[in-house]
């Protein structure tokens, strides 16, 4: 039986860590040192894809024998990227702008094994339609959840689900930050099968 390569999640996101833990695979977490500044003219999807690959590549360069997962998510409101708000005031602005509208969350993932010359990337879109939210609902949600580290200020895995009218996606965990269906397929191709004994 071949030895399973070391698995590394190139992310400091607790949401991605918690999602990857669902696969019951041993893995380490390494913080990727990547500049996440958007480039001029870069689309939200392009930004998510570039950052996912950059995160995986930064860690794979340090750990070439490991299989590395990099991921990034960018919310897209009519072609404008919406990132993590970082503050209450910015979160209020984001949710007011998004209420009653459809927002696409682009969740990109790259799996890379430098020693094995393996690299695959995919971007999973999740379309979310927000309710026509009242200002008092926005305030209550933000004071309760404090989602200032989430793209678009929406934590659908908790109370944020009450903000929504609908979610459309082929990979339900993509909205939380890591598309596990696609990630499993890429891991199998890289030699790590979550279902292998």
Set out the residue ranges of the language-model regions.
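Anionic-ligand binding patches
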Residues: 2-8, 42-197
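N-terminal beta1-alpha1 ligand-phosphate binding loop
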Residues: 2-25
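Short loop/helix-cap segments at secondary-structure boundaries that form the rim of catalytic
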Residues: 18-22, 39-40, 61-62
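Short glycine-rich, Thr/Ser-proximal phosphate-binding strand/loop in the N-terminal lobe
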Residues: 24-41, 118-125
């Amino acid at each position: 039986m071949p030895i399973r390569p070391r698995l590394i999640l190139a992310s400091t996101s607790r949401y991605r860590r918690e999602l990857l833990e669902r696969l019951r695979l041993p893995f380490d977490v390494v913080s990727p040192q990547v500049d996440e500044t958007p480039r001029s003219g870069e689309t939200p999807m392009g930004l998510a894809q570039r950052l996912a690959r950059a995160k995986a590549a930064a860690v794979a360069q340090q750990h070439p024998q490991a299989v590395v997962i990099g991921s990034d998510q960018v919310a897209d409101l009519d072609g404008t990227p919406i990132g993590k708000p970082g503050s209450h005031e910015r979160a209020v602005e984001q949710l007011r702008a998004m209420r009653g509208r459809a927002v696409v969350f682009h969740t990109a993932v790259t799996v890379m094994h430098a020693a094995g010359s393996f690299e695959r990337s995919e971007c999973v879109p999740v379309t979310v339609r927000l309710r026509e939210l009242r200002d008092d609902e926005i305030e209550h949600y933000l004071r309760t959840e404090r989602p200032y580290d989430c793209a678009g200020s929406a934590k659908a895995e908790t109370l944020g689900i009450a903000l929504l009218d609908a979610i459309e996606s082929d990979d339900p965990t993509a909205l939380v930050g890591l598309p596990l269906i696609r990630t499993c397929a890429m891991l199998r191709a890289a030699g790590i099968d979550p279902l292998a004994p």
